[in-house]
């Protein structure tokens, strides 16, 4: 039986990194934390980002990031928490 990872090419890997890093920037958290959310808390990386590469990579960055964050929320990842903390930090700095 072929392992799913056998068909990951450099395009898919580069796209996965692009998604992880841009989600991290939007949520103001580390790429490592986002990777854990997409692989350990959910399986979004292997079940959505990689298999849907052909469609997703044609969209703009904001659409991709917001789409994945919305899916993370649907899967129970507490993304809103990171957004709230960032907003509170910004309020205190202004």
Where are these regions (language model features)?
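Methionine residue identity
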Residues: 84-87
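Amphipathic, hydrophobic secondary-structure cores in small proteins
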Residues: 32-56
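N-terminal acidic leader/helix
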Residues: 2-33
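Long, hydrophobic, amphipathic alpha-helical segments used as structural scaffolds
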Residues: 27, 31, 35-38, 76-79
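Intrinsically disordered, low-complexity, basic-enriched segments
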Residues: 8-10, 21, 36-37, 50, ...
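Long, compositionally biased
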Residues: 51-81
């Amino acid at each position: 039986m072929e392992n799913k990872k056998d068909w990951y090419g450099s395009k898919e890997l580069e796209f996965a990194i692009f998604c992880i890093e841009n989600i991290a920037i939007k949520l103001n958290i580390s790429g490592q934390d986002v990777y854990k959310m997409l692989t350990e808390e959910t399986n979004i990386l292997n079940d959505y980002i990689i298999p849907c590469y052909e469609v997703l990579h044609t969209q703009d960055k904001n659409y991709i990031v917001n789409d994945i964050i919305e899916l993370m929320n649907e899967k129970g990842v507490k993304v809103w928490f990171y957004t709230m903390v960032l907003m509170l930090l910004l309020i205190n700095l202004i």
